[in-house]
Amino acid sequence: RYMRVKMIVAYDGTNYCGWQIQPNGITIEQVLNEHLSRLLKEDIKVTGASRTDAGVHSLGNVCMFDTNTRMPAEKISYALNQKLPEDIVVVDSCEVSDDFHPRFSKSRKTYEYRILNARFRNPTRRLDTYFYHYPLDTEKMSEAAKYLIGEHDFASFCSANSQAQTTVRTIYDCTVSKAGDIITIRVTGNGFLYNMVRIIAGTLVKIGGSDMPADAIKGIIAATDRAAAGPTAPAHGLTMIGLKLSLIHI
């Protein structure tokens, strides 16, 4: 009897070349496959909901795999966490129905991009926060963020080497908040294009640190041209907070 197992995985992406297996570096997917295969004594291949880029962190990526093991699904996380490197943790594991698939599910994904806006670096936040020392107008950034909400063609916010069939996405919420020296850009959407959240962050930083008006975002969206938006903010400031999946029955 085989079962399908869903896992929620948190990781510090600093030392990894992203989620997806690739020939020239170690990835989260590869580490999970190796440890699961060893633990369950069979060849395991996980499928992730979100293929985060190199250096990007996660508090709740979702993946699944099929197995013939007799080990109860909820015990797998405990057994795995004893063997995994300290920068990867399986937060939860459970059995799911055969029609569950993280890629073909409707999802709401939430990302946070964190900026340390201060005169000096903070060495304790260097791995998960982008240091930017020029003053930023968070009120204006917050106002600009509201224009991103809704269904739009986000071609301006997509890296040129994206393989997406369509650049239309829906953003449900986009906020900018400040606590102390840390500015947090929080974005929830139904899916994101390649580097989209980092380009949104870079564009909001450009608006917040210049005399560009908040509603410049409208023109940037309308241009559907990557050159119209701001720079791609560095990967290490980005954390995938989590995602909610609901099944689409095909």
What are these regions (language model features)?
Residues 2-247:
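Structured-RNA-binding interfaces characteristic of tRNA pseudouridine synthases
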